Amino acid sequence: MRRGFGPLSLAFFLFLLALLTLPGDGNQGSVAGSCSCDRTISSGTQIPQGTLDHIRKYLKAFHRCPFFIRFQLQSKSVCGGSQDQWVRELVDCFERKECGTGHGKSFHHQKHLPQASTQTPEAAEGTPSDTSTPAHSQSTQHSTLPSGALSLNKEHTQPWEMTTLPSGYGLEARPEAEANEKQQDDRQQEAPGAGASTPAWVPVLSLLAIVFFLTAAMAYVLCNRRATQQNSAGLQLWYTPVEPRP
């Protein structure tokens, strides 16, 4: 008789089955069993800041594989050790939807949020509104963003992002903008009316010319037909045969 599977063989078989059917994280859109890597970064390797920023920006999904984590980008995949600091930061950043493109919101949009929040207290100077709420939201956003995102915000700050408008600027400029828009509408309405008066005679003259031409052609055809009929009648009378006398 054949011997059955022993406990060790059964345990090894179950372990292989568990590795093959290891489920992925559904929130990150990972595919079960897709642990192939285009590039593997060894543990302890110093990653350039530009490479890390590129992964943050184009990260679409990640998959938890045995002993490492696979990050899926737009055109390739990058793998790193699950215990590495940069790997854990990327996973936390993607789970909080602060980086990557898999959420329908790019990292480029997220990294400009602190500048937008800092404009609120400056634009609200001179108004009786409470400034504690913008400060609280600013501190909350700074605390939720990772350290790499804060450094990127400092590096990529543009001069136009820090410009502030004086209070009441929109209220004063709005009537002038409405008046200018109204004047432009009036000019656009007057221009077609003035230009349409002269070309209005063109189709009328063309129509009259066509009617005159058709009338002359019909008169010519009728005159020719009548003259032809008269000539044929005269010929018939001229060549009328005479019956012989008996």
Curated annotation (Swiss-Prot):
This protein is called what?
C-X-C motif chemokine 16
**Keywords assigned by UniProt, alphabetized:** Chemotaxis, Cytokine, Disulfide bond, Glycoprotein, Membrane, Signal, Transmembrane, Transmembrane helix
The residue spans the entry assigns to the Extracellular side of the membrane are as follows 27-201
Where is it located? Membrane
Family listed: Belongs to the intercrine alpha (chemokine CxC) family.
Which portions of the chain have biased composition (kind: Basic and acidic residues)? 175-189
Instruction: Name the job this protein performs.
Output: Induces a strong chemotactic response. Induces calcium mobilization. Binds to CXCR6/Bonzo. Also acts as a scavenger receptor on macrophages, which specifically binds to OxLDL (oxidized low density lipoprotein), suggesting that it may be involved in pathophysiology such as atherogenesis.
Q: Which residues lie on this side of the membrane: Cytoplasmic?
A: 223-246
Q: What is its main location?
A: membrane
Organism (species): Mus musculus
Q: Name one GO molecular function term.
A: chemokine receptor binding
| Tissues where the protein occurs | Widely expressed. Not detected in purified B- and T-cells.
Q: Looking at the record's lineage, which domain of life comes first?
A: Eukaryota
- Which residue spans traverse the membrane? 202-222
